[in-house]
Curated annotation (Swiss-Prot):
The lineage of its organism: Bacteria, Pseudomonadati, Pseudomonadota, Gammaproteobacteria, Enterobacterales. The EIIB domain is phosphorylated by phospho-EIIA on a cysteinyl or histidyl residue, depending on the transported sugar. Then, it transfers the phosphoryl group to the sugar substrate concomitantly with the sugar uptake processed by the EIIC domain. One of its GO terms (cellular component) is plasma membrane. The PTS domain EIIA required for activity was shown to be the crr-encoded enzyme IIA-glucose, EIIA-Glc. Residues 115-474 form the PTS EIIC type-1 domain. It catalyses: N-acetyl-beta-D-muramate(out) + N(pros)-phospho-L-histidyl-[protein] = N-acetyl-beta-D-muramate 6-phosphate(in) + L-histidyl-[protein]. It comes from Escherichia coli (strain K12). Residues 1-89 form the PTS EIIB type-1 domain. Residues 145-157, 202-217, 282-301, 356-368, 415-440 are periplasmic. This is PTS system N-acetylmuramic acid-specific EIIBC component.
Length: 474
């Protein structure tokens, strides 16, 4: 295990969050150890001063400790082992003692709902990145070497092999989402997966593709399984709630036999009658909104400028359903490269701070340690170690990101919309081969690279002019 996540560090963190008895859950996203807590008043915010911790985000019921990619997973695994070995106090007693205080501090329902997306989508992100990279590399090779789509031979076969993972992922993605969502909302994962599969089946007996469900209407009512991801999330939530209500009244002897059976029958009925049409309308509305924002340069600037703030509050995972909706409606994720400009603006701001700092200052050392991850799309080290503690550079970094978003929005407005070839992927320079557009991969890569350059330069200029005044540069 790396030094930064040693058992001593994790024991110190465990002590500062109130001990094992205050831990309700332990998990991780790509860069953060996420600890659910019963009583937030027991949490010491000075966790962020520990060596190896890049930042801390506190909510009423969760502590997010920023370690960075890879390390967060190891930290969560080691913390789970520590919790398994530690003597645990009565969690229910702790919760009861502090219930009133927790209610007073409770964050909004919207923020809590968005936090669920981390639980649903984080396990899928490595697959998104891997499949997207393989597809991007294969598409780039085919473009540069002028390989026709119907070509035969070793190279075309190898390229098709690299592309098949993306096809498999997005064909059956709703089942994975349904499974994770049902669990996140407190239900049984397999029930969510089965309900999600209803959105994947075909209901047109004359169709030549897909798998026919065996009926084309629901007791005479038409079936319209549009709005895949949005509908699946709603259905998984309903499935978990219905399962909880059924289990409450089900005798223990019949629980395994009847609970899932009744849950599936009720949820499927609701899905066909209400959730599928509702999901379709929400899907169309969300797609319309973000497609129009993407085609509006100023809308792109606002989205890119505000994204770092979403990262700070830990609700940036809430954009993932939007990514999936855009993939369905556009064929690529046009929002992701716009939001990626936020990280590029921060790189420019960090370089300006490095330039203005004293040669042997701690600030220069902090920037050197965080700039490479920032260039590769991992922004937390720069956020929590460099810009956010000084505030003004954080604001100018947001302005630099907004300038990059404005650039991409202008290019789209002039007739070259582009986006990521996957619902999710790496940002920064690593994302270059994942860009695509109707005009091909190379124009999309050029637009993305131009946006990054604009964000770097503007972040640097804004920070040099406005972000260094009355700021500690030591």
């Amino acid at each position: 295990m790396a030094k930064e996540i040693s058992s001593e560090l994790l024991n110190t963190i465990l002590t500062r969050v109130g001990g094992p008895g205050n831990i309700a859950s332990c998990g991780n996203c790509m860069t953060r150890l996420r600890l659910g807590v019963h009583d937030s008043s027991l949490v010491d915010p000075n966790i962020k001063t520990l060596e190896g911790v890049k930042g801390v985000i506190l909510t009423s019921d969760q502590v997010q400790v920023v370690f960075g990619p890879g390390k967060a997973h190891r930290a969560a695994k080691a913390m789970s082992e520590l919790l398994g070995e530690a003597p645990v106090q009565d969690a229910a007693e702790i919760a009861a003692q502090n219930k009133r205080q927790l209610k007073a501090k409770q964050t909004s329902g919207v923020q809590q709902f968005l936090a669920k997306f981390a639980t649903i989508f984080t396990p899928l992100i490595p697959g998104f990145i891997a499949a997207g990279l393989l597809l991007g590399i294969a598409t780039l090779i085919a473009t540069v070497m002028h390989v026709p789509a119907d070509a035969q031979g070793t190279l075309p076969d190898a390229l098709n092999f690299m592309k098949v993972f993306s096809k498999g992922l997005f064909t059956f993605l709703v089942i994975l989402v349904g499974y994770n969502a049902a669990q996140a909302f407190g239900g049984t994962g397999v029930n969510g997966a089965i309900i999600a599969a209803l959105f994947l089946l075909g209901y047109n007996p004359a169709a030549t593709t897909g798998y026919y469900a065996g009926f084309h209407d629901f007791f005479g009512l038409p079936i319209d399984p549009r709005g895949n991801i949005i509908g699946v999330l709603i259905a998984a939530w309903a499935c978990a709630r219905i399962e909880g209500m059924v289990r409450r009244f089900m005798p223990d002897d019949l629980d395994m036999l009847l609970t899932s059976l009744i849950t599936l029958l009720i949820t499927a009925t609701l899905a066909y009658l209400i959730i599928m049409p509702l999901g379709g309308w929400l899907f169309e509305g969300m797609s319309w909104l973000f497609m129009h924002l993407n085609s509006n340069p100023f809308g792109c600037a606002v989205l890119a400028g505000l994204f770092l703030i979403a990262v700070v509050f830990g609700v940036h995972q809430g954009f993932i359903p939007v990514y999936l909706a855009l993939m369905d409606s556009q064929g690529f994720n046009s929002l992701f490269p716009i939001l990626s400009m936020a990280g590029a603006g921060q790189v420019g701001a960090a370089l300006a701070l490095y330039w203005r700092a004293q040669p042997h200052s701690a600030l220069r050392s902090q920037v050197r340690g965080a700039i490479i991850p920032g260039l590769l799309g991992v922004g937390e080290p720069l956020i929590y170690g460099v810009t956010l503690p000084r505030m003004k550079p954080f604001v100018t970094a947001c302005l630099g990101g907004a300038a990059g978003g404005l650039f991409i929005g202008l290019i789209a407005w002039w007739g070259l919309p582009m986006g990521l070839n996957s619902a999710f992927g790496p940002s920064g320079l690593v994302a270059l081969p994942l860009m695509t557009s109707a005009q091909g991969i190379l124009p999309a890569m050029a637009v993305y690279a131009g946006g990054i350059l604009v964000a770097w330069v503007c972040g640097f200029i804004f920070t040099t002019l406005f972000g260094c005044r009355n700021v500690n540069l030591d």
